[in-house]
Amino acid sequence: MRFKGLPLAFLLISTAARAQTSASAPSPAPSPRPAVAVVNLRFDGEHANVLQAGDTAIVAAATSKLLATLAASDRLALVDSTTVATAVAVAEGSGNPCDNACAVAVARKVGARWVAKGTISNLSNLVWLLTAELFDATTGKPVLADSYEIKGDAARMAPAAAHVFAQRVEKTIAEKGSR
């Protein structure tokens, strides 16, 4: 059978080659996910009578949960925690703890648009407080500030509070990241 003077076999090969070419053409790259840096949570013992042996472990567990929750997100890219910790250590070289301005500077240094930081305070034997913030590193301004009162087993509840904060960070970045 002929189609306008061409053999059918030629027409099929030509159509298949065009389909292959358009199928192998690269699709547009997805927009990059916004980068977020996390400055490790710190223990604020200002209100505690005595630093207990497990206090730093509670803060470490909360930091770990915050990092894990953000790392699992498909809406943002978490900057490597070792890279952030190294930048914080350099910034703290003068002996001052990394404050808000330091956290923003660290985010800029590691190429992150966003930076999260916070403290955990032991208010009493039964009550702890996680205070955490998210900053836009382009403006240096906070875009999210949360406090979570932790009652009961702090070793279990502090990571749970950090998980909730991480979810709020993800949502805030998704809402503000496109602006």
List where the protein language model places each region.
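A short, flexible beta-alpha/helix-coil linker loop
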Residues: 43-48, 84-86
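C-terminal/domain-edge helix-coil "capping" segments
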Residues: 20-36, 43-45, 64-66, 72-76, ...
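N-terminal signal peptide c-region/cleavage motif recognized by signal peptidases
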Residues: 14-16
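Short, well-ordered secondary-structure micro-motifs
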Residues: 48-49, 90-91, 128
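Active-site-proximal beta-strand/loop segments in catalytic clefts of secreted hydrolases
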Residues: 39-41, 81-82, 119-120
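Bacterial N-terminal signal peptides that target proteins for export
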Residues: 1-7
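Short, solvent-exposed, polar/charged sequence segments at loop or secondary-structure edges
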Residues: 72-117
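Glycine- and acidic-residue-enriched helix-capping/strand-helix junction motifs
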Residues: 48-61
